[in-house]
């Protein structure tokens, strides 16, 4: 079975993991109630989407 010659250093390990991170979701302010919501989705607070009442609370 193949094994590495040397132990992977902390620096090399961290350089490899630079792209391994969480991204912040795209939050926007609802134009109707001012609550923060995910873009292109119905507002959970007031139930509107693109200025129309879609869901009832």
Swiss-Prot record:
The keyword Plastid does not apply. Keywords: Ribonucleoprotein, Ribosomal protein. It holds the Pfam family Ribosomal_L32p. GO terms for molecular function: structural constituent of ribosome. It comes from the Bacteria. One of its GO terms (biological process) is translation. GO terms for cellular component: large ribosomal subunit. The keyword Ribosomal protein applies. Belongs to the bacterial ribosomal protein bL32 family. This is Large ribosomal subunit protein bL32. The lineage of its organism: Bacteria, Bacillati, Bacillota, Bacilli, Bacillales.
